[in-house]
């Protein structure tokens, strides 16, 4: 198989169990949403190809389990990340309160060369629930938190309604590209067990 040159961008999605990390990824990559909740065990990833300006990039999005007992997996999966996405449920204050922990955990485990400039993106998910009447974390509170972390970009999303998902991941991809690690990707070198089923690629710029 011939070698294909492209830019591989590794993105890690972190947040408490049940905030919708997997649903956001599936909506972005597969345009599918399931009402059935299935906890992620360990870690999994999906990929999507997209074009940013004149660059063809492969976005590799890692979904790590929110359960504390799986946080020991961090070092292996966080290292080499180009961007970290922090997600919470706007209807669950605890999921917002733990963002500091996730932020610190990532920086500790990933150990980026310059922690102050490493790109983070914050997603406030499930804004569709109860027409927004059940939310407990205000947009202002979330933006204030982002400002305290160096003006992290913030998006309010709904995986179910596909609201703001593409816009959020385009921002994520651009942030990751700015922090890229250029790699030669040999597809035959990826273990079969690590390749997600029904991998979907798109050549369009989202």
Swiss-Prot record:
A lipid is attached at residues 204, 206 (S-geranylgeranyl cysteine). GO terms for biological process: protein transport. Belongs to the small GTPase superfamily. Rab family. The modification Cysteine methyl ester is found at residue 206. It comes from Vigna aconitifolia. Protein transport. Probably involved in vesicular traffic. GTP binds at residues 15-22, 63-67, 125-128. It is a lipid-anchor. InterPro entries: P-loop_NTPase, Small_GTP-bd, Small_GTPase. Gene3D superfamilies: P-loop containing nucleotide triphosphate hydrolases (3.40.50.300). It comes from the Eukaryota. CDD domains: Rab7. GO terms for cellular component: plasma membrane; vacuolar membrane. It is found in: Cell membrane. Keywords: Cell membrane, GTP-binding, Lipoprotein, Membrane, Methylation, Nucleotide-binding, Prenylation, Protein transport, Transport. This is Ras-related protein Rab7. GO terms for molecular function: GTP binding; GTPase activity. The keyword GTP-binding applies.
